[in-house]
Amino acid sequence: MDDSGELGGLETMETLTELGDELTLGDIDEMLQFVSNQVGEFPDLFSEQLCSSFPGSGGSGSSSGSSGSSSSSSNGRGSSSGAVDPSVQRSFTQVTLPSFSPSAASPQAPTLQVKVSPTSVPTTPRATPILQPRPQPQPQPQTQLQQQTVMITPTFSTTPQTRIIQQPLIYQNAATSFQVLQPQVQSLVTSSQVQPVTIQQQVQTVQAQRVLTQTANGTLQTLAPATVQTVAAPQVQQVPVLVQPQIIKTDSLVLTTLKTDGSPVMAAVQNPALTALTTPIQTAALQVPTLVGSSGTILTTMPVMMGQEKVPIKQVPGGVKQLEPPKEGERRTTHNIIEKRYRSSINDKIIELKDLVMGTDAKMHKSGVLRKAIDYIKYLQQVNHKLRQENMVLKLANQKNKLLKGIDLGSLVDNEVDLKIEDFNQNVLLMSPPASDSGSQAGFSPYSIDSEPGSPLLDDAKVKDEPDSPPVALGMVDRSRILLCVLTFLCLSFNPLTSLLQWGGAHDSDQHPHSGSGRSVLSFESGSGGWFDWMMPTLLLWLVNGVIVLSVFVKLLVHGEPVIRPHSRSSVTFWRHRKQADLDLARGDFAAAAGNLQTCLAVLGRALPTSRLDLACSLSWNVIRYSLQKLRLVRWLLKKVFQCRRATPATEAGFEDEAKTSARDAALAYHRLHQLHITGKLPAGSACSDVHMALCAVNLAECAEEKIPPSTLVEIHLTAAMGLKTRCGGKLGFLASYFLSRAQSLCGPEHSAVPDSLRWLCHPLGQKFFMERSWSVKSAAKESLYCAQRNPADPIAQVHQAFCKNLLERAIESLVKPQAKKKAGDQEEESCEFSSALEYLKLLHSFVDSVGVMSPPLSRSSVLKSALGPDIICRWWTSAITVAISWLQGDDAAVRSHFTKVERIPKALEVTESPLVKAIFHACRAMHASLPGKADGQQSSFCHCERASGHLWSSLNVSGATSDPALNHVVQLLTCDLLLSLRTALWQKQASASQAVGETYHASGAELAGFQRDLGSLRRLAHSFRPAYRKVFLHEATVRLMAGASPTRTHQLLEHSLRRRTTQSTKHGEVDAWPGQRERATAILLACRHLPLSFLSSPGQRAVLLAEAARTLEKVGDRRSCNDCQQMIVKLGGGTAIAAS
């Protein structure tokens, strides 16, 4: 029997699992509806006999008779043929049920007292049954119905506790019919003397039973079947019991299925508070296993024991306590499940939205994600609207002449889009979800973005509701202007008013003919009016002509100019494209910047000419306009007209102010386009187009007057002069000089209004450099070692860079190849080498420091401005050349002060890794180390000379096109001359201490090797740069003196440096190879110090030569060599006296 019970339990578990997979919401609703309709089909279960023992309960009572028990058990068994044992009935009648409270809504369930005879309960206490593992069931046929005895053996604790178990029963037979039993309530009251009671009940196996649990909203969940375990309890007294169903009035119908194989309970709970009854009984000895369903519902079952025989139930005495209200558990309803699905779906979409908007690595809460998504959508809508506007403007601008005749492009664009904007705003407000948080604004513009201020074009509150342009401010096309000028000229030339007046006088004379016949005496008949009759028609004619001409001027220069209101939609469109042009210039996208600037001009009503006829008309009109603006009478008349217009302003700001503002904006746009054309950033156009843009910028800038700063006005005139100089060449060179002088006159008498970045043009050297056309503006300028990179789209900045390099080259050339100047007596005298070089370097330093001080005419972010701050690269070269000149002059203090600047090499030069920069740097360090006052100065200086010599040789071997070849040559020659002079000075310091006059100190092998290497670099440089020849003979004689070679050849080389030449006997190009004054003085000093006395023609010749060398060195400024020469003169004075005696 135990095996069969276990087999039935296993089958029930399998069927329950299958039921959980197959049940749906409709099936369970039909089941509950079917159960609720069983009251009419089974009236015996709800008879008054069952409810008689519950006084006052109304509809909820219980029965104590055996008939109710028999009927319920028969209904429960269905088709079972088993009969109820009479002993069971007799023992059941001894149970008395107390009356229940009439309140069905009470939180405490009604109590039931079960009395057990004390004689039937053994006194020996029993331990809690041990749950044994379940054995493997044997397969048995399911067609045979078996009877099993189920024993429920609870163990009670010493503390009295009350537990109420409400378990309505559902029995399902093979024919799938349901029978409903009323809920039964069993109250077990225990005490310390109560012993374990074994309740054994015989039930019949029912096929295909399922255990279901109904939640508050009707969702059914499948529960796993309870495990049936067989517990052996041989000492427990068994009493046959027939369970009597009871009826209580509660909020819900609790259904319980009992089965002989120990299948679990199916409870349909409507009130969630009753789910606490499914928790395990909290006793000390009762162990109740817990089962967890698939939906997380916790169920409890009691351990059962399979008995052999039926035993009666003993009455258990004890008191009844009120039950505690069940604790409210976690709500597990279908509504929560559906909400959980919705939340999961919403969370997935929010995560996907976050990945699209902010990326996968961003961390932000849901409201922040939604807010950012809304902002991004608004941004996309705004960008879409902007692109739509720009597309429409460009389409209208491409139409050549049809839309340019008296039509404002900005007004057309805005009027066509107004209706679309209103519809789109309504759609956006309808589609927009509510605010993501309480802090969001209730009303917002559909185009506003939280991260940036809204554009006036997209915010109706910021754009004034006023007409874009009245008909008088639309402007005229240049062809119409030229046509009006031609008609006016023809009217004044042919003067039809004169003919009309003459025709009127003739008509009056015809009306009064001479009547009568006869002869008349010839005589002079004087008119009655006199001279007034002759003057009146002339005055009237000139007055009418003057009115006509003035009207034409007012129409062309005042009413013909397009004017844009400051807060109109056209103005906003213009500024949007202007700012976009600035951004394009900052990125280096010059084509896009030019497109935006052309769109700006089209919005202002000043589109660029697209055909040759339009270009000719525009150029002619600008020439006429510039000529008219120079007439004071015309300017005075225009001012009076503006004052009259100011009395009745069309807008609040006044027509004159708006006209000047529009002229300023157009002038700056023309100026930027002109700069891009000059620098070659745009496709090359015709020279007339460049002249047209230059004249437009100049005319409109002069019309703007105080609206445009003086520095910008000067820059516009200089750019116009530069454009005429580069594109027109010598044909219109006089116009370039005119605009340059005009720019200088705008700076004021003391150049107070000129910006620092343009101050170099006010210097005579700057003017000469600008007008001699020794510069060129390139589209892609190469990087230079001598100046920092200037703005590639600013032609003035490029010319300034070329001027700075020209000054640096002049400063170095004055050291390595000084130029001769002619005096009044046709005698040539070389200028002072060091003074000229220092003057150039001083000018260069002042012009370099003034770079970029001017304020840009456009926004501060524009790239069309000079680099802010001084040119640190050019400043470093200035300091390096100053150190070289100071060392050659013997000014040790100046060398130390400027060497601190040379030590800080700019990063731009360090990145280039140029060997020439390293050579000049180590040469400066060698000169600084050779100064007196240092312990190891000579050795350190020699080491730096070696490094500089190696870098110089590397720079001569570098092949490739350089940006400044002439400047590279002079710097290489200067570096080589400095190294050779420094080596010579170190050798002479070693020899001057102990050697007498006329004797030579021989240098070491390392010194000679280094000198030979530098001399080889000088010879190599002389092949490509002829001025290096003037240094070759002197240094060759020096190395022979250091090595102690034959003095004959040394004397010849020195004689070559001392020889004077005239310009008549030389050819072109040989003048650069002549030695300078400093070379001649150095040669005299070497000959008098190191050559033997026999090589001089007379004993006094050495003193004469030294005196001449001293004068030359003093004139040049070489104080160190001059001091040495004077010391030798003093020594030679005593020696000469001795030799003469």
From Swiss-Prot:
Key word Lipid metabolism present: yes
Region (Disordered): 48-144
Keyword set, alphabetical order: Activator, Cholesterol metabolism, Cytoplasmic vesicle, DNA-binding, Endoplasmic reticulum, Golgi apparatus, Isopeptide bond, Lipid metabolism, Membrane, Nucleus, Phosphoprotein, Steroid metabolism, Sterol metabolism, Transcription, Transcription regulation, Transmembrane, Transmembrane helix, Ubl conjugation
Site residues (Cleavage), renumbered to this chain: D468, S469, L484, C485, L522, S523
Mutagenesis or variant effect for R479A: No effect on cleavage by S2P
Stretches the record annotates as Interaction with LMNA: 237-491
GO molecular function per UniProt: DNA-binding transcription factor activity, RNA polymerase II-specific; DNA-binding transcription repressor activity, RNA polymerase II-specific; E-box binding; protein dimerization activity; RNA polymerase II cis-regulatory region sequence-specific DNA binding; sequence-specific double-stranded DNA binding
Record region (Leucine-zipper): 380-401
Protein name, as recorded: Sterol regulatory element-binding protein 2
